[in-house]
Design a protein with these regions (language model features):
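Sec-dependent N-terminal signal peptides
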Residues: 4-12
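Short beta-strand segments enriched in hydrophobic/aromatic residues
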Residues: 38, 50, 104-106, 144-147
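Short beta-strand edge/turn micro-motifs at domain boundaries
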Residues: 97-99, 122-153
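Short, low-complexity N-terminal intrinsically disordered segments enriched in polar/charged residues
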Residues: 12-44, 48-52
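A solvent-exposed, acidic/Ser-Thr-rich amphipathic alpha-helical stretch
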Residues: 43-107
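Extracellular loop and loop/strand-boundary signature of outer-membrane beta-barrel proteins
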Residues: 115-116
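Transmembrane beta-barrel outer-membrane domains
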Residues: 25, 80-81, 120-122
Length: 153
């Protein structure tokens, strides 16, 4: 009986760890999919990393819902961007919710012919995300960009 109980406990722990690993992977993929979609001019992919009622907070601006988030990208057409994302840290809070912090360096230019000459990064900061499990899978429920360094002359 005791060995059965130990086996059940170990099985439960293993299942929980596997579930947590899947959540970490799904949330990390959202961080990367956001950057890739933005950098490759894919407004639908960009908006679809967010939940239907997702929120993006950026330098005092609030974009709520996929249509508003998609429009934000369309309004910046003609720009070439590159997001370098690192140090992705996922904290699983429940089987349906996780928090993510990632570092981001963004360069934006109006030129479209490669290679683009630039004077440096446009933004150096962090994304603070709340990810939620939805009927569509894991999505960003809320993303806030936090400036860490400002660039001067």
């Amino acid at each position: 009986m005791r060995s059965l109980l130990i086996t059940l406990v170990l099985l439960f722990q293993t299942t929980c760890l596997a579930h947590a690993s899947a959540i970490v992977e799904a949330c990390t993929n959202l961080v990367h999919d956001y950057a890739y979609s933005r950098d490759h001019d894919d407004p639908d992919g960009y908006a679809n990393v967010f939940a239907k009622n997702g929120v993006f907070l950026f330098r005092g601006q609030r974009f709520e819902g996929r249509a508003a988030i998609r429009k934000r990208m369309l309004d910046s057409s003609g720009q070439t961007t590159r997001h370098v994302v690192s140090n992705v840290q996922v904290t699983v809070e429940t089987p349906e919710k996780a928090r993510v912090v990632s570092y981001v360096t963004v360069t934006i230019a109006t030129a479209t012919e490669f290679p683009i000459q630039t004077s440096g990064a446009t933004a150096l900061g962090e994304y603070h995300d709340v990810c939620a499990k939805t009927t569509e899978g894991w999505k960003i429920q809320k993303r806030q960009f936090v400036d860490v360094f400002t660039l001067g002359d």
